[in-house]
Each structure stands twice: as C-alpha cells, then as structure tokens.
C-alpha cells in the first residue's frame, strides 16, 4: 500500500482508470477530473517486468500484434541515471541537493539547456510550499488526467523555480530548473534534462520559454553547420558540439557518455521499464472486498484465513455519490484479529481485473472448496487455445501472465504462461445513436434523410455518435 496520484471524479467521489477519463472529464458524470494523491493498494507486477518481456518470444501461437503491444507496454529502456547538482538550494531552504534524471539519450548531454521536473516530484512539492505561484501552477497541472495521452494533449507549460542545476560535464554551465506539466512522474525519476534540438516536446517548450537550442547530433551527410529551428532532429548521425565526443556515432556517444559520468561519480548506466505496479484499489461496491483490517494499535492486519471470503453487505445505499461501503453503519466496524480492539475494514474493493486474472485456474475444478485445485490445475493448464478481444492485450492478458508467475512463486502451481495459444476475434461494430434526451436508440429505430438522422416513429432529430463495439451483454 502506498500513495499514488490518481484520477478523481469529484461528483462520483471515486477513482477513475485512465480509460474512464474522456477529454479530461469523467466518462459518466462529465465532471472535470482532478489529480489527487491517495493511499492505494498495489500488486508488484513490476518485479516480473523482465521475465514477462523475455517470455513473449516463446508465445509463438499469439498474434504478433498482441505480442508487440505487450512489449511496448512493458517498455524496456536502456540508458543512464545522471545526477545534476543544485547550485543554490539554500535560497529556498531545500533539503534536496541534486536532481536525478533518467535518459535514454546520454549522448545528447551537451545539448541540455534546462531541467524539468514533474508537478508531483518532491522538489516541485517543496518549492510549492514556499512559493504561492508555484503552488497555483501545480493546481493547474493537477486538473489534467494522469494518463500519458491526457498529458500529451495538454499545452506544454512550465514554471521557473528560480533554481539552477550544474551541468555535470560542462564546467560552470548552469541549467534553469522548471516544473513542467508534460513530465511524467511514473516514468524514470520524474525529471528530465531538456535537449530541445533532438526532442520535439523539449523544443516546443524551449521555444515557448526562450531557452537555448543547441544541436549536438547532425546527419552524417551534412558537412556544413547544422542548425535546428522548429523541427527537432531525431534521426541517425554523428555528434557535434560535444567536445571530445565530436564525430562519434550515437551509439558510441552513449557508451562514452556513460563512461564519463561514471568516471566523474555523477551517474551510471541503468535499465528501466515503463510497466508500473498495478493499482488495484477501487471505491466501488461491486468489487471483491480487499481482505484487510486497519487497527489503531496493530496498523494493517490481514483478515484471518478462516474468515475468508469477506462478503459484501446487501443493505447498501446507492443514493449518494462515493463508496457505499464507507457509509455502511455496521459492515466496516470489526474487531482486530490481533488485539481484539475496535478496528475498521478496508472499504476499497479490488479492480475487477483482479478476479479475471486467475479464473482460468478456477475453471479446472469449479467445485473445489479452495480457490482452485492444485491437482486439476496441474493436469489441465496451460489453456491450449484462448479466444478473446484484442482490447485485453495489455490488461487482462498481461495480468493473467503475471498471476501465473506470482501463484507459481508462492507454490499454488507450477506454471509460467497461462495461455499457449491466443486468437483475437473481430468485433461487431455499428454507428451509435441517441435521442435529444441522451437515451440510446437501436439502429432500427433510426432512419436517414438527406440531411440528418431521425427517429422512424416521430421524425425527431437523432444525435449520431461514433462507431461503437457491441456490448458483451
């Protein structure tokens, strides 16, 4: 359990998955979502990142499209971790002395012109405590969703903290430190060095805030002076304006950069993954209760095995927004299994993908008194042929692969991959229609005139929506 930035719907008073945020608003309430720091339960899927990635090669009966989607989702990146020493942290009484940056392009280090940290970075939070304008900027950043897509769509904005960081290899060069709305806290360290000449996002930011743009890579066939104006150069080439590295290829430059920062004691090579731990907390009634009790004395205590499963109460109130389990008069009030004092049940429920991530094992013996039968699972698994939608490529299918490894590790069975073969069938799709009150209409209730769609029976104008997939129900 740890604190995490989440999408918060202020009307429904619940956390929303990134997929439930549409154009910055809750998919159902329509309210602008907020970014909040809340305590959430996680499953440590990141522990298996490399294994999950390497094993994709053996899934030779899976569609190449799904394998590629999982590879990209896990997202292995090789690069360097570099420390940028803050020159003047005492001006804001900061305890932080340096900023760590992960980069996949250490070869462009001499092209750095600024440092940018996420709005959730510890440095940004400390600055905001002492700087009202910085605090206001963070509030604006928190109005965006937490997904990469939401952040990517937003206009690139930054706040100059007034701090500077020393370039680790360029003697005396200082880089201004910004808080930027496009830096993801969930990737790397939540901080970047901006190299505008070779990253379009950094270039847009630099042009907006009048920061230097220094090319340090040029195409191999360009002999004249190479200048970047409004389009970043991201292709192959050789290093320039980089001291002793001039003339090196990009790959050789990366190796030399890592050697240099390691020799100076300001960095090291590092491999990182895009895959993050799976946040499984939901403020919904219909999920499986998380079997945990919170005691003032004993802190977090698991529900004893003899008391499992924890069942949901039937007499719940859905008339108010938020989690009805929080409002239930008796269900959440229990005795601590350790000390017997008054305690409170965990009222968050599991993400529904939690249960579907291991049902393949349950299906081998649905009558078992346990979660599943080890004997039956060993006999039947892995599943020979799985048929399911491609929309599950980086959710259910990846989670099931993780569950197979985790359950094997704790001794429930001996299985690496749950599904030997996978076929992703197509979907039945059709344009969607609503009446003027926002109610869905069947296609046979709608007809098209020369200019618009109207209802068959009354001729009322119909709102034509996007093409939707058919519901499973």
Model-inferred region functions:
Residues 1-94, 98-99, 122, 191-309, ...:
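Residue patterns forming the tRNA-binding/recognition surfaces of aminoacyl-tRNA synthetases
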């Amino acid at each position: 359990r740890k604190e995490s930035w989440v999408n918060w719907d202020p009307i429904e008073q619940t956390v929303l998955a990134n997929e439930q945020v549409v154009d910055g608003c809750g998919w159902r309430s329509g309210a602008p979502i907020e970014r909040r720091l809340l305590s959430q339960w996680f499953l440590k899927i990141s522990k298996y990142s490399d294994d999950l990635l390497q094993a994709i090669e053996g899934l030779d009966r899976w569609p190449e499209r799904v394998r590629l989607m999982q590879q990209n989702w896990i997202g292995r990146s090789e690069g360097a971790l570099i420390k940028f020493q803050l020159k003047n942290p005492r001006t804001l009484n900061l305890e932080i002395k340096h900023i760590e940056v992960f980069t996949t392009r250490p070869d462009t280090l001499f092209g750095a012109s600024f440092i940018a940290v996420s709005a959730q970075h510890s440095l940004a939070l400390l600055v905001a405590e002492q700087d009202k304008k910085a605090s206001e900027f963070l509030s604006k950043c928190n109005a965006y969703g937490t997904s990469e897509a939401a952040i990517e769509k937003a206009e690139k904005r930054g706040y100059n903290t007034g701090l500077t960081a020393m370039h680790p290899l360029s003697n005396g060069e200082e880089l201004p430190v910004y808080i930027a709305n496009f830096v993801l806290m969930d990737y790397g360290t939540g901080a970047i060095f901006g190299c505008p000449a070779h990253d379009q996002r950094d270039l847009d930011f630099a042009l907006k805030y009048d920061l230097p743009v220094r090319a340090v890579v040029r195409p191999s066939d360009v002999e004249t002076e190479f200048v970047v104006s409004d389009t970043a150069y991201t292709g192959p080439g050789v290093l320039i304006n980089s001291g002793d590295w001039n003339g090196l290829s990009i790959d050789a430059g990366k190796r030399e950069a890592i050697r240099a920062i390691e020799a100076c004691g300001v960095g090291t090579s590092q491999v990182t993954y895009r895959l993050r731990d799976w946040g499984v907390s939901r403020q919904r009634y219909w999920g499986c209760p998380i079997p945990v009790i919170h005691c003032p004395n004993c802190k977090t205590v698991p529900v004893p095995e003899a008391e499992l499963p924890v069942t949901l109460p039937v007499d719940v109130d859905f008339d108010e927004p938020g989690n009805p389990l929080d409002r239930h008069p008796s269900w959440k009030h229990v005795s601590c299994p350790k000390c017997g004092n008054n305690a409170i049940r965990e009222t968050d429920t599991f993400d529904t993908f939690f249960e579907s991530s291991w049902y393949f094992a349950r299906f081998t013996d649905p009558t078992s008194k346990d979660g599943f039968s080890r004997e039956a699972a060993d006999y039947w698994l892995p599943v020979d042929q799985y048929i399911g939608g491609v929309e599950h490529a980086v959710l259910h299918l990846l989670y099931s692969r993780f569950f197979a490894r985790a359950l094997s590790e704790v001794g429930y069975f001996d299985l690496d991959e749950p599904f030997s073969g996978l076929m992703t069938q197509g979907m039945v799709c059709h344009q969607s229609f609503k009446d003027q009150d926002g109610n869905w209409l069947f296609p046979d209730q709608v007809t098209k005139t020369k200019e618009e769609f109207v209802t068959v029976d009354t001729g009322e104008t119909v709102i034509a929506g996007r093409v939707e997939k058919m519901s499973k129900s």
